[in-house]
Regions:
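Rossmann-fold scaffold of SDR-type NAD(P)-dependent oxidoreductases
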Residues: 32, 87, 111-134, 181
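Glycine-rich phosphate-binding loop and adjoining beta1-alpha1-beta2 segment
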Residues: 60-78
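Glycine/serine-rich phosphate-binding loop and adjoining beta1-alpha1 elements at the start
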Residues: 1-15
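Canonical Rossmann dinucleotide-binding motif of NAD(H)/NADP(H)-dependent dehydrogenases/reductases
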Residues: 14-59
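Rossmann-fold cofactor-recognition segment
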Residues: 72-94, 98
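Catalytic loop of short-chain dehydrogenase/reductase
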Residues: 20, 131-213
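Conserved Rossmann-fold cofactor-binding substructure of NAD(P)-dependent oxidoreductases
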Residues: 89-119
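N-terminal Rossmann-fold cofactor-binding loop
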Residues: 57-62, 90
């Protein structure tokens, strides 16, 4: 009887009593470059397990992406965790700006006299810019190829950081955006990987900018 009572008690216990299940409960996290079995996907799953509201972006809305999102939420979400899957081509500055605008503004739907709030305006607290293309090319290929890779992995990231960090700045001076950059010790050591090494080196400059600007 005691065993059954213990099992019933554990079943009724709120997940919010688990510290790990609520460690990100107050966070709005943006994770870019999500695809099944990717590092970004694992980050999303960890955030959901901590109760975060997560905006995950993918350049593709293939059935496999949607299936992953449903499974990730079903298996990992705790408490009031939410997962929004948003299409975005982050090598396009227009898409970067549109994503920032969408996150920072309330989204409504009006039907006749009824207005429904689809999502509130958010002030993101965590940003994981993991979107990246397949990288290839030697120094002899520098030019358009390197530029397209750097646009997604570096310049688009800088633009997004600037956009997200300014959301709510006029009304909440204490608000901070924590950015987790996907760094690497590979600074051109392997060769043949396009603009990868240059981009990873440039992340050091972004960190310095955070202190200086």
């Amino acid at each position: 009887k005691a065993a059954f009572q213990k099992a019933a008690s554990e079943a009724l216990e709120s997940v919010t009593s688990d510290k790990n299940a609520s460690r990100y409960a107050n966070d709005i996290a943006i994770v870019t470059g999500v695809s099944p079995n990717s590092i970004a996907a694992q980050v999303v799953e960890g955030l959901l397990a901590g109760g975060a509201t997560v905006v995950a972006t993918s350049h593709s809305f293939k059935p496999s992406i949607k299936a992953w999102a449903k499974q990730a939420y079903r298996e990992h979400a705790t408490g009031n965790a939410k997962l929004w899957l948003v299409p975005a081509n982050l090598s396009s500055y227009r898409d970067v700006d549109a994503l920032v605008d969408w996150v920072g503004h309330e989204q409504k739907k009006t039907s006749g006299a009824t207005t429904t709030i689809l999502k509130p305006a958010w002030e993101p607290t965590l940003f994981f810019p993991f979107a990246a293309p397949p990288v290839h090319g030697t120094l002899a290929d520098s030019g358009d190829l390197f530029e397209s890779q750097a646009r997604l992995m570096l310049w688009g990231v800088e633009r997004a950081i600037a956009g997200f960090s300014h959301i709510g700045a006029d009304t909440n001076v204490q608000h901070k955006l924590h950015v987790v950059l996907p760094g690497s010790p590979n600074r051109g050591v392997f060769g043949g990987d396009g603009a990868y090494g240059e981009v990873k080196s440039a992340f050091d400059a972004i960190v310095n900018r955070a202190r200086a600007e």
